[in-house]
Amino acid sequence: MFFMLKSCYSKLRQILKYLISIFLFINFLYANSSTLVLEDEFSFNENFEISYLKDSSNELNIQEIANSNDFQKHSNKFSLGYLKDTIWIKVDLKNKSSKEDFILSLNEHFYEKANMHYFDKSENLWKTLKNGVFTPIKERNIETSKLAFNFKIQQNSSQTIFVELKAKYPYFGNIAVYSKDYFFASRILNIDSFFILQF
């Protein structure tokens, strides 16, 4: 009887190890990656992970931000409340598609400063695209009332983008990444829909 119990216990341990292994495998398989992968069927994504950093000094430059390890993970739908700090948002992207032109957009318009920073590997320097509620539409990277930025990622390469936000109002919003053609097609459809309703 003792050997029978020992045999059952041994089999039970093996089954338990097997179940735990399957559970861990499934967890890793569906884990939320912090890198947004852009593939050929990609048109837009509004559900991915970002990282953010609160700069209470309001004086950090892009070099210091890029080298910082103080970022906290968050979904791209964020609500950080009223702060006097500058908020830096980090978005990691990997381009596995045949496209190279993409657009990053914030759905909230009331940021005094909403600048996008990225490292241009061909010129070996940081570039800044300025935007914000007080930036005239004619001076924006994309002439739209949205806070939107046009950027390129070469095929089969990765890029980290930093968005610098400064506001007098609460920090909240949603960051989305679009393929360039989808962004402009949906924008035209929205404008046309408005005029159809007018006449």
List the predicted regions and their residue ranges:
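Selective detector of the "anchor" transmembrane alpha-helix that sits immediately C-terminal
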Residues: 191-199
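N-terminal secretory signal peptides that target proteins for export/translocation
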Residues: 1-14
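Soluble non-transmembrane domains of integral membrane proteins
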Residues: 32-191
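Prokaryotic Sec-type signal peptides and long signal-anchor helices
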Residues: 6-7, 27-29, 75
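Intrinsically disordered, low-complexity segments
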Residues: 5-8, 19, 143
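Bacterial N-terminal signal peptides
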Residues: 19-27
